[in-house]
Amino acid sequence: MSDLSGKTIIVTGGGSGIGRATVELLVASGANVAVADINDEAGEAVVAASGGKAAYFRCDIAQEEDVKALVAQTLAAFGGLDGAFNNAAIPQAGLPLAEVSLERFRQSMDINVTGTFLCMKYQILAMIERGTKGSIVNTASAAGVVGVPMHGEYVGAKHAVVGLTRVAAADYGKHGIRVNALVPGAVRTPMLQRAMDNDAGLEPYLNSIHPIGRFSEPHEQAQAAVWLLSDAASFVTGSCLAADGGFTAI
């Protein structure tokens, strides 16, 4: 387990799935965690289970004032900011590109791209102001590395996240700030579990498209994210860590 004792980390989308698993592992690794979500009940439940090492802040990452407030509240609560896991996103699938409405496309870009940009912007500014050599991890996707049919707006958004990650790594390496992307394949999140409950063929299909023969559990993504956030990855920046069971290898 990585040692993050005394470090302060923001986790967006921290109320469920990969975000929740990452909060739990960060707390177990000694970190203080600012849990951000738009689901107050879920976020507060994660904090209640943290043993006093986490605080919940409501944040819609597509809203600049919310993101600025999240960073300010984190600094006020914990006295610094050492890292961030920008994980909040909305997955969308099921339509060929020409059938995607402009409204749906913009929603994907607003949350998945603009939200990630805003989070990085204000996290980086806070780190530079305090001279902190921090680490930022953005959740991309296998869909941010390859084309996936029927996922047009999501593929476009996650490719943009990968690009923003690489640019930020190049821009801010001189400040000692590392920026990397986590690239999951399919993950057993609550949303995916609901979809599988309604479609008996979905789980066997997802297993079949990952060379490892199954898809990921949230804690496996959390382990990868926490490693990137830790000093164990001190020379890793601008990278896309594929924790995807081989999905992007074929």
Curated annotation (Swiss-Prot):
- Care to name a GO molecular-function term for this sequence? 2,5-dichloro-2,5-cyclohexadiene-1,4-diol dehydrogenase activity
Q: Where does substrate bind?
A: S141
Q: What induces it?
A: Constitutively expressed.
Positions bound to NAD(+): 9-34
Pfam families on file: adh_short_C2 (PF13561)
Report the function annotation for this chain.
Catalyzes the dehydrogenation of 2,5-dichloro-2,5-cyclohexadiene-1,4-diol (2,5-DDOL) to 2,5-dichlorohydroquinone (2,5-DCHQ), a step in the degradation of gamma-hexachlorocyclohexane (gamma-HCH or lindane). Has an essential role in this assimilation pathway that allows S.japonicum UT26 to grow on gamma-HCH as the sole source of carbon and energy.
**What pathway is this protein said to act in by its record?**
Xenobiotic degradation; gamma-hexachlorocyclohexane degradation
Sorted alphabetically, which InterPro entries does this protein's record hold?
NAD(P)-bd_dom_sf, Sc_DH/Rdtase_CS, SDR_fam
Phenotype upon gene inactivation: Cells lacking this gene lose the ability to grow on gamma-HCH; growth is restored when a plasmid containing the linC gene is introduced.
Identify which residues the record assigns to the active site: Y154 (proton acceptor)
Family assignment from sequence similarity: Belongs to the short-chain dehydrogenases/reductases (SDR) family.
UniProt EC number: 1.1.1.-
Protein name stated in the entry: 2,5-dichloro-2,5-cyclohexadiene-1,4-diol dehydrogenase
Which keywords fit this entry according to its UniProt record? Detoxification, NAD, Oxidoreductase
What reaction(s) does this enzyme catalyze?
A: 2,5-dichlorocyclohexa-2,5-dien-1,4-diol + NAD(+) = 2,5-dichlorohydroquinone + NADH + H(+)
Look at the named UniProt entry and state the broad enzyme category this protein falls under: oxidoreductase
Q: What's an example Gene Ontology biological process for this entry?
A: response to toxic substance
